[in-house]
A protein has these predicted regions:
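Conserved ATP-binding N-box helix of the HATPase_c
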Residues: 10-31
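A conserved short beta-strand within the histidine kinase catalytic ATPase domain
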Residues: 33-38
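Short beta-strand elements
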Residues: 230-240
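Conserved small/polar residues in nucleotide/adenosyl-binding loops
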Residues: 245-250
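Conserved activation segment of eukaryotic-like protein kinases, specifically the C-terminal portion
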Residues: 72-76
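GHKL-type ATPase core
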Residues: 43-61, 66, 77-206
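Bergerat-fold GHKL ATPase/HATPase_c domain
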Residues: 1-17, 68-69
């Protein structure tokens, strides 16, 4: 609960957000243009991106591959190292390892430097060393598939509508990134694509779509000072809604400081 909020549907969906947030970080760093989130018929979820691929080299301090550190050690995410991500949306390097620990099993497949690598974990434990399984050509990216642990979660059925709302927000907040949500569960098959070049300016248009705007043009500005980047879009309407996001996760305007 400390990391994902609950062991119900909210926490279950959060597992997907955490893996997807790592892909968003790749986009914010300029290396990922598409994320595919798939709800599989067997209860697993798959998150695939076309980023650089999680590093596979051996870490000098631990003696294990960087990808294994990401999935088995807290605070081992790429955003902590030198040259890490300038902006990040996840749990600051703990997200992937938490998802792994809360899953019956998790498999990661990486395309990097022309080669494909795979590794499997069960309840957080490494099943075999990272292995090279083939070639990728020019393709790069990371694919993660996991099965939430029924011994931990009270609910193991993903809520498509909640995921759709969050992934839509994620796409609005990371302009240019395409996110495709696919439901392959029997009797629930559907797909939705989110891709917004207008970013949060387009998000305001979406939020105001059924409201009466008090003026036609959206107020927009962006800037950076002392290493803090700020982007603002607003358009007053005849009701009251205040939404606040930081990097690019939602926050409660009443409690955020």
């Amino acid at each position: 609960g400390m990391y994902i909020g609950s062991v119900g549907t909210k926490g279950l969906n959060h597992l997907i957000y955490e893996i997807a947030d790592n892909s968003v970080d790749e986009h914010l760093a300029g290396f990922c243009t598409q994320i595919n989130v798939t709800l599989n018929d067997d209860g697993t979820a798959t998150i695939k991106d076309n980023g650089r691929g999680i590093p596979t080299g051996i870490n000098n301090k631990t003696g294990i591959p960087a990808v294994e550190m990401v999935f088995t050690m807290l605070h081992a995410g790429g955003k902590f190292g030198t040259g890490g991500y300038k902006i990040s949306g996840g749990l600051h390097g703990v997200g992937a390892s938490v998802v792994n620990a809360l899953s019956e099993w998790l498999e990661v497949s990486i395309c990097r430097d022309g080669k494909r690598y795979e590794q499997r974990y069960e309840r957080g434990k490494t099943m075999y060393p990272l292995k090279e399984v083939g070639e990728c050509g020019d393709s790069t990216g990371t694919t993660v598939t996991f099965l939430p642990d029924k011994q931990i979660f009270e609910e193991t059925v993903y809520d498509y509508d909640i995921l759709k709302q969050r992934l839509r927000e994620m796409a609005f907040l990371t302009k240019g990134l395409k996110i495709i949500l696919t439901d392959k569960r029997e009797g629930m098959e559907r797909e939705k694509t989110f891709h917004y070049e207008g970013g949060i300016r387009e998000f305001v248009t979406y939020l105001n779509r059924s409201k009466e705007a008090l003026y036609p043009e959206i107020i927009y500005c962006e800037g950076e000072k002392d290493g803090v980047a700020v982007e603002v879009a607003m358009q007053h309407n005849d009701s009251y809604t205040c939404l606040l996001y930081t990097s690019p996760s939602p926050r409660d305007p009443k409690t955020s400081r």
